[in-house]
Amino acid sequence: LTVLWLDFETRSRVDLGSKGVYNYAQDMSTEVLCMSYAFDDGEVQTWVPKYTPDGMMWLNNSPFPEAVAKHTGPIYAHNAAFERLIFWYVLQINFDLEQFYCTATQARANCAPGSLEDVGRFASVSMKKDHRGAQLIRLLSIPQADGNFREDAGLMAEMIAYCEQDVRAMREISKAMRPLSAEELADYHVNERINDRGVLVDVPLAKAAMRYAHDELVEIEERVAELTDGEITSVRSPKMREWVLERVGDEAKKLMLVKDKYSIDKTVRANLLAMENPDEIPPAVAEVIQCADDLWASSVAKFSRMADLADDEDCRVRGAFVFAGGAATGRASSYGLQVHNFTRKCAKEPDAVRQAMVRGHNIVPAYGKRVTDVLRGMLRPALIPAPGKSFVVADWSAIEGRVNPWLASSPAGEAKLDVFRAKLDPYKVNA
């Protein structure tokens, strides 16, 4: 079958990073700047539409390429979901999902980086991605300060050259790697169907959580200013690390030393709070650290992302899953909402907590010691399965620890496998 290689460059008033590819593609402001394409090993060509106040016109009265519109074979693109959704929602050309082959997925399945630039270095191919692209996107794909898009023939010529180079680079890189197996490709298409269906989320709950988080932020920063006599007014301040470092004991300082630098990151904060030694961590310092932990809680950010990514019409978050996103293992990963990484903690009475939150009632101390504790327990209840259905999350236990010794096929490897066969805890055995 003839392979169609292609790449789109687009512009939109929607921020792709914050709103996600589905909301981006479906927005009425999203337009195609150019489409570069090639069939098999043929020359790369480019189609450029022209926009008027009445809508999209074809440049020089040239219609959309008929050979592309009628293509029934495989369509190769890097991060192919983007091209597929632009076809569906912007150009309204309904190619079958099964026609699409994602070269970024192919790269990850080969334990290579997913970005076109990085995988080019990995594959050591001569055809490279053009570094100018990011600048051109900022200039042409994003509205200016006055809200209008830049119209510049010279920059557009550069954009076309950049788009064509991406097609050449993608084609050469893909050919340099092992292709996806039939099973991998089928699994990729299943992943995309799941992404198209989306996950229903509780938007009113997410917005309520954001209000509680904002109110707590004000209280936290007031408390931090009080505890530090005004030296620190925000736990996000770089001064906080130095303030803590000056007031903790020698053992605590050792815990703060990470790769020859002092840190106050999540792991360090957890270790310091676990000491529970007033000689090492004075009570006021411990409270400031706890305030920082509350403020930086990932649950707050997840609720914000949930509200941003949810479709305005049906409250579904789409495009959340990345097939073979864990490049080292091939396991699934997640974009945006990071649904694969929700805390296991769940509120004991989620319905009661939700009712209290959406009504604006006090949730502390009735449902937890701190607001962040309550919010953390409401992340999973914010995902809503269809009636009569359940969300199931499963993962292989210690997959790398099992596969690597099996691949080694050595006495030492067999000894490690025997630990798993005996159902022992490898961490305890190694300790």
Task: Give residue spans per PLM region.
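Conserved "right-hand" nucleotidyltransferase catalytic core of DNA-directed polymerases
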Residues: 1-14, 34, 135-375, 384-390, ...
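Cytochrome P450 core scaffold surrounding the K-helix E-X-X-R motif
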Residues: 13-17, 46-48, 402-405
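A short alpha/beta connector and helix-capping loop motif
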Residues: 16-34, 407-412
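Metal-dependent catalytic core segments for phosphate chemistry
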Residues: 22-23, 400-431
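Short, surface-exposed loop/turn microsegments at beta-strand edges and helix-strand junctions
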Residues: 27, 94-98, 371-375, 382-385, ...
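Active-site-proximal helix-loop-helix substrate-binding element of RNase H-like nuclease domains
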Residues: 30-33, 37, 41-62, 69-178, ...
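Short active-site loop/helix that positions an aromatic residue
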Residues: 81-93, 110, 242-248, 397-412
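Cytochrome P450 catalytic domain signature, combining two hallmark sequence patches
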Residues: 94-97, 218, 251-258, 352, ...
